[in-house]
């Protein structure tokens, strides 16, 4: 069995008093997802999450707290891989979703209360639900 570790972020910003979340579109724009990626050597999971949010979504956040881990299995070259993705909650500090990098098709703001319905992956929908329940208390 192979294990892989990644990290990602739910970055929240208020517009007109309502919380919005930075999300990215991948796979020719057909999949709405959270920014995430592999943990680089010497990087903590929280540092990776902040970097991935900055690179993929074009925005910079302040770490609020860890939201949780998403675990799932997949096959690679005939071997089972256990993937663990640690997600962190961030509050918006600066930047624009127009400044996303080439790894994603686009980045956008999504109303946080709609994110659990719109995100493509179950684990990420759960992280958005957790962020929705915690964001009011956190900021």
Per-region residue spans from a language model:
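Active-site segment of metal-dependent pyrophosphate-handling enzymes
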Residues: 58-95
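NUDIX/MutT-family hydrolases
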Residues: 91-131
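Conserved hydrophobic/aromatic beta-strand scaffold that supports enzyme active sites
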Residues: 10, 23, 87-89, 109
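N-terminal strand-loop-strand
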Residues: 1-34
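Short aromatic/basic micro-patch
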Residues: 33, 82, 109
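The catalytic Nudix box helix
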Residues: 34-67
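Short, charged/polar surface micro-motifs in flexible loops or helix N-caps
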Residues: 16-18, 28-31, 40-41, 69-71, ...
